[in-house]
A protein has these predicted regions:
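Conserved glycine-rich
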Residues: 80, 184-185
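Conserved catalytic submotifs in the C-terminal HATPase_c
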Residues: 54-59, 76, 81-91, 128
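Helix-loop junction within the histidine kinase core
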Residues: 44-55
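Short conserved segment of the HATPase_c
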Residues: 143-157
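Short alpha-helical segment of the dimerization/phosphotransfer core of two-component systems
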Residues: 28-33
Length: 208
């Protein structure tokens, strides 16, 4: 925005292609800022016990599959292969659909961020009777043992010298952990530097 203003003041001609490029950057930055603000607000509500979930019976297999497939084009544009696999066709879970979608988007988006072109992201669902396991596994750069315990910390930016793992504000993963906890579930990561990471969500079928 400031760059365009400066160019206009100097009466510098901007080609339509350049203008479109600058506008795309502005849109992305605006989206990131709005996402950060929303995460800050939600984080505050959760910490103050004022965040309310709207739980209904949902087919978790359909919910996760649709969420992941909606990201398919974005993932493949990065040159990354996407695999979705489940050992159960249908599984009803009492949950807030919007917030579970949000967690899946956060985890898959995180996997994309740290997986190079030619890599693989695999999302799987396993039936554990009274629970369900959702896994987002990537062939990315991985996380060291030392940094695993920090990955869900609020505002933490994980930096591993050997893997150069950067986690931005860290709020996306923090919010995901908080939301899964509100569902009575658990979320954790298994990872090896240079091999990849696997973020695992365990959700109870009924958590009222």
């Amino acid at each position: 925005n400031q760059l365009i203003k400066d160019l206009c003041k100097k009466e510098v001609f901007i080609t339509p292609e350049k203008l479109s490029y600058y506008m795309d950057i502005m849109d992305r930055n605006t989206s990131r800022l709005l996402n950060l603000i929303n995460n800050l607000i939600d984080n505050s509500k959760i910490e103050n016990n004022s965040y309310v979930l709207t739980k209904k019976d949902e087919d978790i297999v359909y919910l996760v599959e649709e969420t992941v497939l909606d990201m398919k084009d974005y993932i493949e544009e990065k040159g990354i292969e996407l695999i979705f696999d489940t050992d159960v066709e249908e599984k009803t879970v009492r949950c807030d659909k919007t917030e579970i979608e949000r967690c899946i988007i956060n985890l898959v988006g995180n996997a994309v961020k740290f997986t190079s072109e030619g890599g693989l992201i695999e999302v799987t669902i396993k039936d554990l009777d009274d629970k369900v396991k959702i896994s987002v596994k990537d062939s990315g750069i991985g996380i060291s043992e030392e940094n695993k315990r920090l990955i869900f910390d609020r505002f933490n930016q994980v930096v591993d010298k050997s893997a150069e793992l950067k986690g931005g504000s860290g709020l996306g993963l923090t919010i995901s952990k908080q939301l899964i906890t509100l569902h009575g579930g658990d979320i954790y990561v298994e990872s090896e530097v240079g091999v990849g990471s696997e973020f695992i969500i365990i959700l109870p079928v009924n958590n009222d």
